[in-house]
C-alpha cells in the first residue's frame, strides 16, 4: 500500500503543478506541520475529508485542538471544514436507515461526479517539499516506531504458513498441498506489493507480482475501462495484462474488482462516485442507453456495481455510528485490509480483555459484560468480526484462519498489548486459533461454549483449502437466510433455555438487520465450507498458556456432557466451569460469567506480580 500511495501522490503533484498549484508534502507530527503551514499562508479555513476511522478522526481532533489553543497575528484561529462525496444524495445522515432493506426502498438518487476544479496559482514562495522515496518513507516509519510496535513483524506471515510450519516441526501429518488459487498464495503475491518482482514498462501495476492497480487517476480509469471490457478481448498490451490479473484475483465470483481497485478507491485516486458512474455509463452504452431490469450484461459490470455499493453502504453505517448515538457503548472504526471494522473500548486501567462474539452476533452481544468487567478494573475491548453486525461483509472466502489474522492484527495495531482472549461459539474457536499461532499475544484463553473438538492423540491435522463456492451453496445460503429471518426469535430462545426473556427486541432486531446487509449471503455460504478440523487440544498445546472453559450445560448445539468429559480426559491443564445455561452463557447469565472472568483474570495477573516481587 505504501508504494501505491507514493504513485498516487506523484500523480496528484503533477496534476496540481499543471494548474500552477502544488502539493505540499511533509513528514512528521500532523499538529505541528499543519500549525506551521497555517501560519505561513494565514489560512482562515482548512478543508479535510470526513473520516470514519477512529485513528484518523483522532488526528483531525488533535489538529483542531492545537489550532484552537494557538495564537494568530491576523485574528481568530482557522476553522476546520469537513467535506465528503457520498454516492447517494441524502439530505440528513441521521435520517438514513441502518436497515439496507429499508434504505433501498427510499430510492435515493445517485450523486454524479463533480468536475475537476480550476485552482488559483500558488504564488506564496512556499517550500512544497518532494514526494519521498519508498525507502525514505519506510525509514521514517521505522524511526517513528515505539517499543509497542515491535509486534508488527508478527503480521508478515500468514496464519496458514505458520500452521504448516508448526505441523512440520511437530512431525504431524497434514494435507499440505495447496491449490494455486488459494488466498494464501494471493496474499504471498500481494504482501509488500511492488517491493519484489520485475517492473513492467507502462504497466498498470507496481510489479508483475502485484494485483492492485497503481498510479494516478488516468491510469486507474484506463484500468477500469479495461476491466469492464474483460469479455471483449483486446490487442492493447496493458489491457491484456489487466485481464490476466482479473483471472488471478477472481477467487470468488466478483471478488476481482475489490482486489484490483479497492486500494485506489481507498486512497482517493478515484471516487466511488466516479467508478460507479463510469461503470453504469458503460452498461448503458452496451444497451442503447438503457439499464436492463433483468441484471447487468457482463460479470465485471455486476462485480463493480456490487463492490462499490457494498463499500458505500458500510461507509455510511460507519459514518452514522460516529454522528449518532448508537448502542450502549461508543463505537470506533478500524480499517483492516481495507475493510471497515467496528469495535468498542471501555475502561481506564488494568489488564486488557478482548471479547469475541459467535456466528451471526456482534459486539453488542456482550451488552451486560463490557461495562461490568471494566468497572472491576479492566480495559475491555470488544470487536465485531468482519462479516457480522455492522462491520463490513466483503466478498471474500471466510475461514477460521482469516478471522484469526483479524484478531492478531487488532491486538497488534489497536490494543498494542497482550490480552485475555475471551470468545463464544465460533468466536471461541477463532480465539483458540489466534492463541495457538501467536502465543505472545494472549495472557490467557477463555472459551464460552466454543466450537471445535478434542481429538485424542492427534496425528493428522487437515488444512482446509479455499475453493470456489458453487451455485448450489449460494442457493442454500439464500434459502437458509430466509428461514433464519422468519425463525430468529424462536431459535434464540432455544439457545437461552433458562432465561428466554433475555431474547429481547433489540437483540432480535439487530440480527435481522444484519441479515439484509450486502454480503450477508456470502458469509452464510461459508457455513457450508467451514472445516473446523484443527483440534482444540492441538491449539491448547501450541498456546501453552492458561485456559478456562466456561460451558453452558444446556446448549442445544453441542453435547455439553460429552465435551466436558473429553476436556477432562485429554486436557488436564484446562480449568472448567459448568453453568446452568445454554449456548451463550455470557448473555444468558451475565453476572455469573462476569464474576468467573474477573476471578480468573485476577488469578492470572497475581502470579506475574508475585514473580516480579520475588525477583526484586
Language-model region placement:
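Trp/Phe/Arg-rich N-terminal binding region typifying the photolyase-homology
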Residues: 1-154
Amino acid at each position: 500500500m505504501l508504494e501505491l500511495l507514493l504513485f498516487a501522490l506523484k500523480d496528484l503533484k503533477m496534476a496540481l503543478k499543471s494548474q500552477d498549484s502544488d502539493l505540499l508534502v511533509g513528514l512528521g507530527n500532523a499538529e505541528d506541520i499543519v500549525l506551521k503551514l497555517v501560519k505561513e499562508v494565514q489560512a482562515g479555513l482548512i478543508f479535510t475529508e470526513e473520516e470514519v476511522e477512529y485513528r484518523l478522526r483522532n488526528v483531525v481532533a488533535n489538529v483542531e485542538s492545537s489550532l484552537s489553543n494557538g495564537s494568530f497575528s491576523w485574528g481568530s484561529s482557522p476553522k476546520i471544514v469537513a467535506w465528503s462525496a457520498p454516492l447517494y444524495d441524502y439530505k440528513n445522515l441521521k435520517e438514513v436507515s441502518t436497515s439496507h432493506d429499508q434504505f433501498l426502498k427510499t430510492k435515493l438518487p445517485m450523486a454524479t461526479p463533480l468536475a475537476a476544479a480550476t485552482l488559483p496559482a500558488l504564488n506564496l514562495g512556499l517550500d512544497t517539499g518532494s514526494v519521498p522515496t519508498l525507502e525514505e518513507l519506510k525509514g521514517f516509519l521505522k524511526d517513528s516506531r515505539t517499543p509497542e510496535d515491535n509486534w508488527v513483524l508478527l503480521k508478515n506471515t500468514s496464519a496458514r504458513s505458520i500452521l504448516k510450519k508448526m505441523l512440520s516441526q511437530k512431525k504431524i501429518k497434514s494435507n499440505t498441498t495447496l491449490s494455486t488459487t488459494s488466498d494464501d498464495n494471493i496474499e504471498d503475491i500481494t504482501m509488500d506489493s511492488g517491493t519484489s518482482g520485475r517492473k513492467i514498462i507502462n504497466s498498470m501495476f507496481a510489479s508483475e507480482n502485484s494485483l492492485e492497480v497503481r498510479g494516478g487517476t488516468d491510469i486507474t480509469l484506463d484500468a477500469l475501462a479495461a476491466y469492464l471490457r474483460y469479455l471483449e478481448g483486446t490487442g492493447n498490451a496493458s489491457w491484456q495484462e489487466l485481464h490476466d490479473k482479473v483471472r488471478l484475483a477472481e477467487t470468488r465470483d466478483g471478488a476481482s474488482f475489490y482486489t484490483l481497485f479497492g486500494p485506489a478507491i481507498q486512497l482517493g485516486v478515484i471516487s466511488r462516485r466516479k467508478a460507479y458512474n463510469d461503470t453504469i455509463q458503460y452498461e448503458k452504452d452496451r444497451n442503447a442507453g438503457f439499464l436492463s431490469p433483468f441484471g447487468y450484461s457482463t460479470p465485471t459490470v455486476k462485480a463493480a456495481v456490487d463492490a462499490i455499493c457494498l463499500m458505500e453502504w458500510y461507509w455510511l453505517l460507519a459514518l452514522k455510528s460516529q454522528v449518532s448515538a448508537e448502542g450502549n457503548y461508543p463505537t470506533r472504526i478500524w480499517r483492516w485490509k481495507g475493510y471497515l471494522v467496528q469495535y468498542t473500548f471501555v475502561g481506564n486501567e488494568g489488564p486488557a480483555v478482548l471479547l469475541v462474539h459467535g456466528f451471526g452476533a456482534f459486539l453488542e452481544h456482550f451488552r451486560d459484560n463490557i461495562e461490568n468487567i471494566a468497572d472491576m478494573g479492566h480495559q475491555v475491548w470488544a470487536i465485531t468480526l468482519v462479516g457480522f453486525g455492522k462491520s463490513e461483509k466483503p466478498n471474500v472466502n471466510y475461514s477460521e484462519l482469516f478471522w484469526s489474522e483479524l484478531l492478531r492484527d487488532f491486538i497488534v495495531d489497536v490494543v498494542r498489548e497482550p490480552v485475555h482472549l475471551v470468545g463464544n461459539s465460533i468466536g471461541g474457536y477463532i480465539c483458540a486459533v489466534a492463541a495457538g499461532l501467536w502465543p505472545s499475544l494472549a495472557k490467557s484463553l477463555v472459551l464460552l461454549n466454543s466450537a471445535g473438538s478434542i481429538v485424542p492423540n492427534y496425528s493428522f491435522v487437515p488444512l482446509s483449502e479455499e475453493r470456489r463456492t458453487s451455485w448450489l451453496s449460494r442457493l442454500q445460503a439464500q434459502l437458509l437466510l430466509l428461514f433464519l429471518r422468519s425463525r430468529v426469535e424462536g431459535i434464540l430462545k432455544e439457545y437461552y433455555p433458562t432465561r428466554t426473556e433475555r431474547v429481547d427486541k433489540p437483540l432480535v432486531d439487530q440480527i435481522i438487520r444484519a441479515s439484509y446487509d450486502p454480503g450477508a449471503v456470502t458469509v452464510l455460504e461459508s457455513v457450508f465450507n467451514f472445516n473446523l478440523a484443527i483440534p482444540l487440544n492441538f491449539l491448547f498445546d501450541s498456546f501453552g498458556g492458561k485456559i478456562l472453559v466456561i460451558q453452558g450445560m444446556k446448549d442445544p448445539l453441542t453435547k455439553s456432557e460429552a465435551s466436558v468429559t473429553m476436556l477432562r480426559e485429554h486436557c488436564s491443564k484446562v480449568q472448567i466451569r459448568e453453568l446452568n445455561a445454554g449456548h451463550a452463557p455470557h448473555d444468558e447469565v451475565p453476572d455469573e460469567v462476569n464474576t468467573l472472568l474477573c476471578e480468573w483474570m485476577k488469578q492470572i495477573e497475581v502470579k506475574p506480580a508475585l514473580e516480579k516481587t520475588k525477583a526484586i
